[in-house]
Amino acid sequence: MQCIKCIEINLLQKKLGYFFHTVDLLLRALTHRSFSNKHNERLEFLGDSILNYSITNILYHRYNHMDEGDMSRIRSSLVCSRTLVELAKEFKLGNCLKLGQGELKNKGYNRESILADTVEAIIGGIFLDSNIKTIEMLIAFWYQFRLNKIDLEDKQKDPKTRLQEYLQHHHLPLPIYCINQVQGQAHDQIFIMNCQVSSLKYSVMGRGSSRRKAEQDAAENALKFLIEINND
């Protein structure tokens, strides 16, 4: 039977900067559906909404010069799976996950989707264990370095946005994205997307664990080719 040692729970709570009054909430947040029907998906749903609200509130009050478009774009970069996975690794969440045998064999403790979902579940758990003010302060603490690095220039924009703006600037048609291939089993798929740009002879491919990530990767690759060809 899989168990989580008290020392691991204490280390995790130290990294979070929060000690649960009801530790069962933390244990539930760490429980994947493959381990038990008392899993973390409801907490994840709650945490997702709280994270979006908290980041929005922080941006609104911290950057009063920021317009709606910039806030939306930067919020997206702060709450995306990639950033949540970074947080999960900082917390060393993989050491504490409660996974079924199948997920353990497939190294589920390294799967980005599981790590990102667990961070959201922990946020939901802390909210239920305390209040909105406490979790918002914690989120601000976790994101402090990232918030300090916020730059409203192009490097904060996602690759698809940057590619679109590049093409518009050069008076070229917008790109077309289409699925090339889907590899792997349903629980661990890799999407391969084509990005078609009129000024490139061939479609440019991108890979990712979701269609959106694959499109972003393809856009990034297409933009690199265009910049290299045009010496921009």
UniProtKB/Swiss-Prot annotation:
DRBM domain residues: 158-228
Subcellular location: Cytoplasm
GO biological processes: mRNA processing; regulation of gene expression; rRNA processing; tRNA processing
Keywords: Cytoplasm, Endonuclease, Hydrolase, Magnesium, Metal-binding, mRNA processing, Nuclease, RNA-binding, rRNA processing, rRNA-binding, tRNA processing
Coiled-coil intervals, chain numbering: none
Catalytic activity as recorded in UniProt: Endonucleolytic cleavage to 5'-phosphomonoester
Gene Ontology molecular function, alphabetical: double-stranded RNA binding; metal ion binding; ribonuclease III activity; rRNA binding
Domain of life: Bacteria
Residues the record marks as active site: 48, 120
PANTHER family: RIBONUCLEASE 3 (PTHR11207:SF0), RIBONUCLEASE III (PTHR11207)
Protein name as it appears in the record: Ribonuclease 3
Organism expressing this protein natively: Blochmanniella floridana
Gene this chain is encoded by: rnc
